[in-house]
C-alpha cells in the first residue's frame, strides 16, 4: 500500500460507524478508543516532525566551535549520506500470502457456520412444530423409536416391570 493510499484510508475511517455496525461493546470499545487515541497522537507527532526544519546550519557551527576540521568532516559526511533502501517485496509477498490464507480460512469458517446455522434452524423448526409430550401416544413413541417396542415386549414376556437403572437415576417413588 502506498503512503498516499494509507493516508487516504486513515482519513476515511469512521470510528463511530465501526462501533455501531459491528455491535461492539465493553472492553472492545474501550480498546478501540485507546487505539484511536494512540493513532491521533502518532499522527500529531508525525505532523510536527514533518514541519520541523531539516537543514543544518554549518556556518553557525563554524562560528561557535573552534575546531573547524570537525565541522567540515561532519558536513562532508552529511552531504554524502544516502539512506539505505530496503527491498520489502519479500515481506509484502509474505503478508499478501498470509492475508490470502486468512481470507480463505475465513470463508471456509463462514461456510461451516452458515451450515450449522441452517441445521440449528431446522432443529428449531422441528422443536417448535413437535407435539407437546403430554399429547403423545405409545404408538407415536413406537413409530419414532421402533427398537423400544421390541425391548418392552421382551421385558413383559420375562415379567420385568421396572426399567433397569431407573431408581438409581431418578430415585425410588415407593412409599412403603
From Swiss-Prot:
Signal peptide limits: none
One Gene Ontology biological process: proton motive force-driven ATP synthesis
Subcellular location(s) of the protein: Mitochondrion inner membrane
Single GO MF annotation: proton-transporting ATP synthase activity, rotational mechanism
Cross-referenced Gene3D superfamilies: 6.10.280.70
Record's bilayer topology term: Peripheral membrane protein
Primary location class: mitochondrion
Protein family: Belongs to the ATPase d subunit family.
Subunit field text: F-type ATP synthases have 2 components, the catalytic core F(1) and the membrane-embedded component F(0), linked together by a central stalk and a peripheral stalk. The central stalk, also called rotor shaft, is often seen as part of F(1). The peripheral stalk is seen as part of F(0). F(0) contains the membrane channel next to the rotor. F-type ATP synthases form dimers but each monomer functions independently in ATP generation.
Record's protein name: ATP synthase subunit d, mitochondrial
Native organism: Yarrowia lipolytica (strain CLIB 122 / E 150)
Amino acid at each position: 500500500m502506498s503512503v498516499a493510499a494509507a493516508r487516504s484510508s486513515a482519513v476515511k475511517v469512521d470510528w463511530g460507524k465501526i462501533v455501531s455496525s459491528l455491535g461492539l461493546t465493553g472492553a472492545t470499545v474501550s480498546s478501540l478508543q485507546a487505539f484511536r487515541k494512540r493513532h491521533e497522537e502518532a499522527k500529531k507527532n508525525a505532523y510536527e516532525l514533518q514541519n520541523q526544519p531539516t537543514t543544518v546550519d554549518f556556518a553557525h557551527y563554524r562560528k561557535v566551535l573552534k575546531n573547524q576540521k570537525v565541522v567540515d568532516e561532519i558536513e562532508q559526511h552529511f552531504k554524502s549520506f544516502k539512506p539505505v533502501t530496503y527491498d520489502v517485496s519479500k515481506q509484502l509477498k509474505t503478508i499478501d500470502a498470509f492475508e490470502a490464507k486468512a481470507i480463505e480460512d475465513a470463508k471456509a469458517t463462514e461456510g461451516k457456520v452458515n451450515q450449522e446455522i441452517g441445521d440449528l434452524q431446522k432443529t428449531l423448526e422441528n422443536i417448535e412444530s413437535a407435539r407437546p409430550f403430554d399429547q403423545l401416544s405409545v404408538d407415536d413413541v413406537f413409530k419414532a423409536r421402533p427398537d423400544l417396542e421390541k425391548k418392552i415386549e421382551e421385558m413383559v414376556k420375562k415379567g420385568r416391570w421396572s426399567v433397569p437403572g431407573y431408581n438409581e437415576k431418578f430415585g425410588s417413588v415407593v412409599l412403603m
